[in-house]
Amino acid sequence: MARTRSKFIVPGILAVVVICCAIVCTGGILLYFFGDALLALFSPTSPIAVETPVVVQETPGSDSSGLPEWTIIVYSAADDEVLEENMWFDVNEMEVVGSTPQVNIVVQMDRYQGAFSGDGDWTDTRRFLIRKDNNLESITSPIVQSVGEVDTGQPQTLIDFVTWAVQNYPAKKYALVMSDHGGGWTGGFSDMSASSYSELSIPEIVSSIEVIRQNTGVDKFELIGFDACLMGQIEVFGSLYPYSNYMVASEEVEPGYGWSYAAWLEQLVQNPTVNGDGLSQSIISTYVINDVLLTGGRASAEEIAQEESTTTLSAVESAKVPDVIGAMNLFLGAITEMDQSLVAQARTYTRSYFSLFGEEVSPSFIDLGNFAEVLTTLTDETEIQQTAIQLQAAISSAVVAEKHGPNMSGSNGIAFHFPDSDLYYYTEYNSDFPPYYAESSARFLEQSVWDEFLAYHYTGEAFAPQDGVAVAPSRTAEIVAPGASEMNVGPVQISDTQISGDETVTVTSTVEGNVAYIHTALYFWDPESESYWIGDVSYYIADNMITIDGVNVPDYGASPIQVEYEWSPTLYSLTDGEHDSYILLEPAEFQSSDGETVYQV
């Protein structure tokens, strides 16, 4: 990135410096998906012939002593323009290791028509028994079955494949890995080629696994993993823990290349007797840093570190998820007694993750443990302090493995959905967003009082926990934002109207209100289009900061806030060495754990 400096003339009619204040509620919502496509690195080859599987039926309670230790079942919903090539390469990574007498690796992959054209450009849905090879340019494993074009966003597709995999490749332990886009409690694993867009909701994944249990007699998967974005949420874990011993997922978005399959599968085939705890440890310890796409000189150590800096991945022991929900319930009961504007403040300052609903609303996916930690800094109430400690202890006990990059400090392994008032309306009142949060997260909410708390927090409804029920708010009740306030920004004063080179001007103003963050923005007036273009948006760095669980937040002091800072005429551009292009960097993190202010394109 190049910093471009040039002489600036700053009369008020040509450029305007604006002070912007972030509070608790904003509007405008759009559902986003995340993923990065690979570069077109590999040449196409022809598909190979179908191989017929040997069917071995297993009945519940039958002797499994002669069976392989593991069958790894990968549901690769790659019928997606963005992620197809990445997910195709993941299967090539699996072939670096391949199946062994003790570890079966079985993949169903549905490709997209019109995106990645490599490896014969096939677009149907194929099932592979992964065999070892060193060819990263094509999938050479035998096609055990071709099932034509199927809709991977339909529950029956998941049911059919996993049932088939268990019946044809029985083992002592099973791992189900679901790979594609993810969206936490909203679900994921879509099919972009379907006649109408489809994806699997969390209730549909749950019901699919229940049918798979009936079909196969497998009571629990040793591990359920989501190689997908944003699935590391209590809403997801709280819905699926009865069906597994361990679960692996990420609180934050994942890079497009996903998990480091070759690395953790190699550890598994070297020690196949490990349980889900051991397998989880391998998946997480190898994440990013051992990915075939990055290793072997394909990326520098600095580039790998940069990739890892914004990632998260965690594993939870399923049997301990109810303890987390129980501790969360006690904590929520305690914080109903405190000023709800302080709860809103804690939500704003908690470690947050990618905003699935767009940049115009506050991020709603935040870390559960960090939220409890932040709240303890805002009150001295003994019950809140004690229940926060209990919740953090329950999370620590349930999370058996976790890693996060330096820019993701405050991540403890389990996130949850805490919307601001606008998003609460959108996901609970707006008929254009079916299904509602209460319906999508029903399995979790039936055990939790989080739904009752949200209704209390935003509508003032009495906090009345109802066991075994997912509570939807009274949709006639008025929603009130507890942290919202009147906001006033005084006149912006600039010490000079002409600067150049490394010179600066002093900008001063006064801000009144319940302020979370202060941004400064530079606008240029374009007389031809009669509109402004944005030159720069920056954080106003407070003189004092508070650090909570590694997360830095500003301490502006009491309102009114006196703003004074030195502004320099800096614009940014991207260059490839030959061409430069101006870019707008938007604020992403106030200050990371290493003291750096983070911006993103």
Model segments located where?
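Membrane-embedded alpha-helical segments of small multi-pass membrane proteins
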Residues: 7-36
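Gly/Ser/Thr-rich loops at beta-strand to alpha-helix junctions
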Residues: 79-82, 180-186, 225, 229-233
